Amino acid sequence: MYLINQNGWIEVICGSMFSGKSEELIRRVRRTQFAKQHAIVFKPCIDNRYSEEDVVSHNGLKVKAVPVSASKDIFEHITEELDVIAIDEVQFFDGDIVEVVQVLANRGYRVIVAGLDQDFRGLPFGQVPQLMAIAEHVTKLQAVCSVCGSPASRTQRLIDGDPAAFDDPIILVGASESYEPRCRHCHAVPANKDK
């Protein structure tokens, strides 16, 4: 039996908000730089919480990033000398992101994506479940529940301190002022704001 060492694979980092997804993506990108590999980082234009041209973790770590509006815009920035392509907040990209990631991995790039696997309602979010299914490596991170201290796998959206209703808009970019990590048992999603 022969071991064939081929380049090109997909890594998914997922979990709730405040679980360390961006921090882990930044850590992996920095490690590639120590190995003298060339990396590029992308983020969706919609993510402008801390910076327009950096991926920034909640604890302040950051790495330069190229903001893009559409998934296929990523191809415009890909060059042959690159080894690693990292994409943060992947849940905010359009449906083409799955194909883009597949094409890049098939071309021999190590592709690292990070994003929320569930929306604030606790349902699968965007294209992340599909990316998890096709990835060679999946890392699911957990935060700490802000209510009871248990491992948190959910993201609680708060509006004026109260849980957001099930029918509220799915995408609302924010940080600690509008979201907090919760465990399954402390996570709440009222069916109607009036109830």
Swiss-Prot record:
UniProt keyword annotations, A-Z: ATP-binding, Cytoplasm, DNA synthesis, Kinase, Metal-binding, Nucleotide-binding, Transferase, Zinc
Active site as annotated: 89
Pfam family of the protein (one): TK
Record EC number: 2.7.1.21
GO cellular component terms given for this protein: cytosol
Localisation: Cytoplasm
Reactions the enzyme catalyzes: thymidine + ATP = dTMP + ADP + H(+)
One annotated GO biological process: thymidine metabolic process
Main localisation: cytoplasm
Binding locations of ATP: 15-22, 88-91
Sample GO molecular function, one term: thymidine kinase activity
Domain of life: Bacteria
Binding sites annotated in the UniProt record for Zn(2+): 145, 148, 183, 186
Cystine crosslinks: none
NCBIfam families from the UniProt entry: PRK04296.1-1 (NF003296)
Subunit and partners: Homotetramer.
PANTHER family to which the protein is assigned, alphabetical: THYMIDINE KINASE, THYMIDINE KINASE, CYTOSOLIC
Family the UniProt entry places it in: Belongs to the thymidine kinase family.
Identification of the protein by name: Thymidine kinase
Species the sequence originates in: Bacillus cereus (strain B4264)
Organism lineage string: Bacteria, Bacillati, Bacillota, Bacilli, Bacillales
Gene that this sequence comes from: tdk
